């Protein structure tokens, strides 16, 4: 409908009014965020199409850790810690976002360093072993490779190369420089095979930025395995093979074709600051750093 206001002198103004059903739900653009002290983030909220809300109020469970503008949803990190921001509609519907406020720099200094000299293509195994050693588990990279790493051969059959989905098994053997590697799902599975009677469990976290992972985990003293490239150099596609082995983590079907990305490399992320990420690198057998801008391209 249209509302009109007319002054005695004839001046007129109009306002178009649309009446919609009251929103029955509410969604924020993030369920959790990581902020540095002093950093801000706008938590936008939305309601289902065709509905409306008269107002939306934002609140923080601990404004000494992260403050939020009451009517706007802009969150600002104040001090390290965790808090929860809640958005409430006029009908009582709510949505929440967990907020982690972290220091601008963190380095975990006591992470054991293991080079891959015994396992030429075993960067994933060495990184997993470093992580296990950090949590106090006494296991060598060769023992992990021999007893816990799922390995499937790479070969040639019926006119094409054959091998496993690298999400489901190591392609070849880490003892050979002519082998390939493995991705996060199978490494998590292998680590949890070792940890089956232990208090810790390995968890795969995909689709998150290194900035998020640094704030959520490294800032809390937890190093993490990440996949990038050797020396952070550009990668390129190489060998293609027909997939002949999968498991519950498969991203490729049996009989389909997979093309390996050359230069794939697994490292242990141990720190960050304004400009750099810090790693335990099994390839160089060194604690090294790479610029954030470079790492984010790999």
Residue spans of the language-model regions?
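Short, conserved catalytic or adaptor-binding loops enriched in Gly and charged residues
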Residues: 48-49, 192-196, 298
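Surface-exposed patches in mature extracellular/periplasmic domains of secreted proteins
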Residues: 137-145, 199-208
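Active-site-adjacent structural segments surrounding the nucleophilic cysteine of cysteine proteases
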Residues: 102-189, 230-232, 238-252, 257-261
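Low-complexity, Gly/Ser/Thr/Pro-rich intrinsically disordered linker/tail segments
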Residues: 282-283, 292-298
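Mid-length scaffold segments of soluble, non-membrane domains
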Residues: 175-178, 182-186, 190-203, 211, ...
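Active-site-adjacent substructure of cysteine-protease-like catalytic cores
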Residues: 207-280
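A short, polar/proline- and glycine-enriched secondary-structure boundary/capping micro-motif
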Residues: 237, 287-294
């Amino acid at each position: 409908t249209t509302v009109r206001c007319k002054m005695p002198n004839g001046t007129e103004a109009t306002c178009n009014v649309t009446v919609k059903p009251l929103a029955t739900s509410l969604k924020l653009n993030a369920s959790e965020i990581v902020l540095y002290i002093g950093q801000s983030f706008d938590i936008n909220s939305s309601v289902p199409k065709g509905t409306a809300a008269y107002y939306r109020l934002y609140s923080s469970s601990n404004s000494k850790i992260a403050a939020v503008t009451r009517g706007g949803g802009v969150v600002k990190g104040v001090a390290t810690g965790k808090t929860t921001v809640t958005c409430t509609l006029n009908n009582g519907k709510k949505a929440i976002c967990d907020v982690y406020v972290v220091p601008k720099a963190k380095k975990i200094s006591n992470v054991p360093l293991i080079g891959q000299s015994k396992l030429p293509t075993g960067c994933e195994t060495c990184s997993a072993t470093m992580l296990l050693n950090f949590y106090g588990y006494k296991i060598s990279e060769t023992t992990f490779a021999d007893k816990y790493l799922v390995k499937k051969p790479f070969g040639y059959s019926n006119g094409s190369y054959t091998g496993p989905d690298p999400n489901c098994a190591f392609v070849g053997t880490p003892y050979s420089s002519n082998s390939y590697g493995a991705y996060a799902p199978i490494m998590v599975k292998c680590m949890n095979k070792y940890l089956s009677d232990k208090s810790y469990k390995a968890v795969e976290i995909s689709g998150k930025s290194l900035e998020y992972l640094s704030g959520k985990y490294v800032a809390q003293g937890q190093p993490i395995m990440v996949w990038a490239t050797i020396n952070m150099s550009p990668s390129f596609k190489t060998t293609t093979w027909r997939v002949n082995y999968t498991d519950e983590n498969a991203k490729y079907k049996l009989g389909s074709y997979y093309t390996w990305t050359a230069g794939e490399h697994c490292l242990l992320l141990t720190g960050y600051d304004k400009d750099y990420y810090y790693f335990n690198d099994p390839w160089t057998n060194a604690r090294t750093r790479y610029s954030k801008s470079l790492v984010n391209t790999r």
